[in-house]
Amino acid sequence: MQSLMRVVRSASALWPFYIAVVAVSTLVAGLGLVTPFLLREATDTIVAKLGDATLPDPTQTVIWLAVALFAAEAMASVLRNVSGYLGDVMVARIRQILSTRYFAKLLALPQRYYDNQVTGTIIARLDRSIANVTQFIQSFTNNFLPMLMQVVAILVITAYYYWPLTVLLALLFPLYTWLTALTSKRWQVFEKEKNANIDEGNGRFAEVVGQVKVTKSYGAEVRELEKFGRHYTNTVDITRPQSRWWHSMDTLRGVAMNLIFLGIYLILFTRTLHGHFTVGEMVMLIQMVTMARQPVTMMSWIVDSAQRAIAGSRDYFQV
């Protein structure tokens, strides 16, 4: 993780983008939380009218609530795309900074460094490491950051209604993090070995294509093809235990999360049944719990992307 933070610090000139993305993401998260409250009001209004026909006609109230829902969701959609635009430009700038600095560092290295390196491997390492880092940052800023902010707000809101709900929701993240930590160390070992084979294979490919006349003059086509194929065969052999380990642990994470949500739904249903929550409040809380579940279900993918980014950033600074 330190190497990934080092990448962010190395692009510190982009701090206006960092601030803008955080600010817009905060607004998106806030607007996303408006919808459950409006649905609560609409549900309770309709239930009250159905239960007591003598109440005033709530049609106008329901219509205005629907208009408010549209306004909140439309504004959130606009801001989400503004945040996406800022994130895309920021990532392009980070790619520019990292690529330029990598090239400048290579130009400053002495000739003896290149005597022990395959040129294509250097190029492959640059492409892979920067691609992994920028893809993770782009996904985090465009999708995961607003969700995390929403989760914090949801924990505060559920604590107001019934604190055991907050405890169960809050348990999801340390549990997921702990199980991921058990997975990550072994996964990184596999990934490092796999990246080395990919870099070496792509490096040989670039070298052979760049000097194809020399390759043919020595009749080395078959030998080079065998070397290239061997590296990618190795990646298949490494991927099998790596993927088996990752998905077995991901299954464990998923079952643990489902058990926690079983407790959450039992609390919501039973407390509504006994009159502690109105039907509207139950609908609101279910929607908020579902919103909190989304970043948790995405966490496997985020962690996978983060691990690739960490491995890539580590390779980036090894030159």
Per-segment meaning from a language model:
Residues 220, 244, 292-319:
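Cytosolic ends of transmembrane helices, especially the final helix of ABC transmembrane type-1 domains
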Residues 13, 17-30, 142-193, 264-277, ...:
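Transmembrane helices of ABC transporter permease
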Residues 17-22, 62-69, 117, 135-136, ...:
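Hydrophobic alpha-helix/TM-entry signal in multi-pass membrane transporters
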Residues 18-82, 159-164, 275-279:
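Transmembrane helix-loop-helix hairpins at lipid-water interfaces of multipass membrane proteins
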Residues 27-31, 35, 67-91, 171-186, ...:
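Hydrophobic alpha-helical membrane-associated segments
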Residues 1-18, 121-122, 126, 234:
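A short amphipathic helical element positioned immediately N-terminal to and/or at the very start
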Residues 12-13, 111-112, 128-137, 141, ...:
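An intracellular "coupling" helix at the cytosolic face of ABC transporter transmembrane type-1 domains
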